Amino acid sequence: IGSNTIVLLVYEMVEHYPTAILHISTPAHLIDYVNVDRIMSKEGILKATEVLQSYADKLDEMQVQYRFADVTEPCRIQNQEELVQALQTTGWDIYPLSGNEEALYDFLGTKYSYPNLTNGSAFDVGGGSTELISFKNGQPIDAMSFPLGCVRLRHLPIDTPECEREILSARREYPS
């Protein structure tokens, strides 16, 4: 569950490797329901819950019993507990991810997709945050997350105190 889209992926194990058999991506624009105080509105929570319930219905049709959802940037809000409780009513196991956890998952995805790539950096520019991960000899050496993604930046008016405050806040967390 991301700031911009909610994705359903169903995997089947084929010769000990996960193989995707279903991929649905629903634009939910959850970031649009989060105010400047980092509180998601009731409408945003309802939107996320409705999408997750529609996915649960699809999995019921497929007779998939185990289901879990990682929640990225949308869960880094003041009313996280309210969002998680609402999402759990759909029958899913809900796992809120910190920015660094998200970056480490990005690393694992990169490693899986490019098994011969052992040194480098990966970037994940999402709707509400950007994750950076550096790796050497196939191992992560540094991971960070900035609360600035393409949708959030699009909503910030350029050359305003609000924009400057958001960027400086992100920079303070990760001094160069």
What spans do the regions from the language model cover?
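A short acidic Gly-Thr/Ser loop motif
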Residues: 1-5, 123-129
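Conserved phosphate-binding catalytic cores of ATP/NTP-utilizing and phosphoryl-transfer enzymes
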Residues: 98-121
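Phosphate/pyrophosphate-binding loops at sites that engage ATP/ADP/AMP, CoA/4′-phosphopantetheine
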Residues: 53-67, 169-176
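A glycine-rich helix N-cap at a beta->alpha junction
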Residues: 92-97
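Short glycine-rich, Thr/Ser-proximal phosphate-binding strand/loop in the N-terminal lobe
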Residues: 5-43, 136-162
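Short beta-strand-loop/turn "lid" adjacent to the catalytic site in phosphate-handling enzymes
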Residues: 58-85
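ATP/pyrophosphate-binding catalytic subdomain of soluble kinases
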Residues: 154-176
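Glycine-rich beta-strand-to-loop/alpha-helix junction loops that act as flexible
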Residues: 71-75, 126-128, 176
